[in-house]
C-alpha cells in the first residue's frame, strides 16, 4: 500500500462467515439501521401544556442558575443541575422527525419513557405508563390509583400512553424503527411496590422484590450506592422474586403488542437493556425468548461495556452497545501521546469481529459516545484518557469543557466516516451532528440545539454547526446508498503506521468499495489497489483514479471499484 521503509500489513480478508451458531439470526432490518439516541427531556419541547414544574427555558445559558436554583444552598454540581427539567416530550419528537429523516437515520433508541422523576427516567416510578410530562401531563396519579400492579387486566391506557403509541405509528409510517430503554435492574423510590415495602415492611406483598439488608432500621441496596435506585433482589437464576419477574414479562408484552391481538406492528421494535450484566444470564435467556415469542423480528441490545461473548452466542441479546469499537476508534483517531497505530486498531477490531458471530457483528450498535460518556468532540480535546474515565469537570479540574477547536471537529468527522463505513450499525448521540459538546454527566445532556430557536444565550458558542450537519448527512447518505457498507464483507487492505493510514474494503456481489482513513497530522500518499476507482467521498465527481493518490490530514476518502 505504501513505499520505502514504512510497514505495510498483509491484506486480511474477513468474510463474516457464520460458524459459531448456524441457527443464530438477527433482524435483517437491524443490519440496515443507522441509529440515533434520544434523551427525550433534552431533545425538543413540542408543547408547554405538559411541562413539569419549573421547566427551564430551552435557550437559557447552561451554567447560569434559574431564580429557584441554589436557594437552599446547593451549588451547580451539588446538585441542582441534576434536577433540571426542560420539557422535552413526545410531541417534540414527532415535530422533529423531519430533522431525523433529512439527516438520514432510520432507527431511534429512546432513553427511558416510563413514568419517573427527574430528566433521565432511569428511576422508574411505573413501567405500566409513559411519563406524563412526555405525553398529556397530569394523567398518571388517577390511573395508578385504579390499577392492581400485578393484574394486567386492570391496567388502563392513559392519554400519555396513547400519545406514545400514536408516535410509534407515525414514526413507523415514515420508515423509522423505535426501541426503548428497559431498566429492569432497579426502580425509583416512588415505584408502587417499593412504596408498599416502605409502608408495610416485611409484611408487604412485595417484600421479596427488593434487596433489603435490614428491616429495623430499614436499609436496602441501591444501584451503585444511590438510595434513590432500589435494586431488585437477585438469585443465581436472575430475579429472586417470581412475581417481580412476572411483572417485567407482563409489561414487556404490553409495550410490544399494545392491543394484545398477536400483531406486534403497533408496538415498539425492541429494547436497549440497562446494566443487564447485573442480572444473571438465565433470566435474560428466558426474557429474550419471551420477547421473540411476541415479535420474532424484535431487536435486543444490551449495555455491556466490555467484551460480550457470553451475551452474544444466540441465547440472549442480538447486540450490545459497542463500546469496544469506540475505545479503539478514540485510541487511534483521538489520542496523542498514547495513540495506537492503525495496525493495532486493525488487529483489535479484527479480534472483535472474530469473537462474535457474523449475524451479531452486522447489528452491533457502533457508537462513539452516549448519555453515559463525555461528548465525542469533547473527548477529542481531552485526549489520552481511558475511555469514560476522568471526564467529569466537577471531579477533574484538568478536563477542558470549553467549546472544542476546529481540529477536534475535524477528528470528529473522521470518526463519523469510520462509523458509517465500518461493519456494524452506526449510532449517533443526539446533537453530535450539530456540534454539541460537553464533559460527562451532566454536561453531555444539554438541550438540543435547533436553528429555529436561535439565538441562544451565549450565542457566540451555542448554534447549529451547519457545515458539520451537512457532513453527517453526506456520510449517512453514503452508507444508505451502498448496501455493501451495511451488509457487505469486510477486508482489511492494509495499514501504514508511518503515515497513520488504514485502508479497508466493503464488498458484496454487486460492488466493492474502498475506504482510506488518514488519522495523521500530515497529508498522506498511498497507492490504490490495482484497478480503477471512482471517487464517492468527499466528492462523487471526477474520473476514475488509480496508482498513487493523496489524502489530507485527519480525513478520509472513499471509492467505488469500476467493474
Q: What function would you assign to each model-found segment?
A:
Residues 34, 545-563:
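C-terminal beta-strand-rich structural cap/linker in extracellular carbohydrate-active enzymes
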Residues 168-176, 186, 195-201, 251, ...:
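Active-site-proximal helices and loops of the catalytic beta/alpha 8
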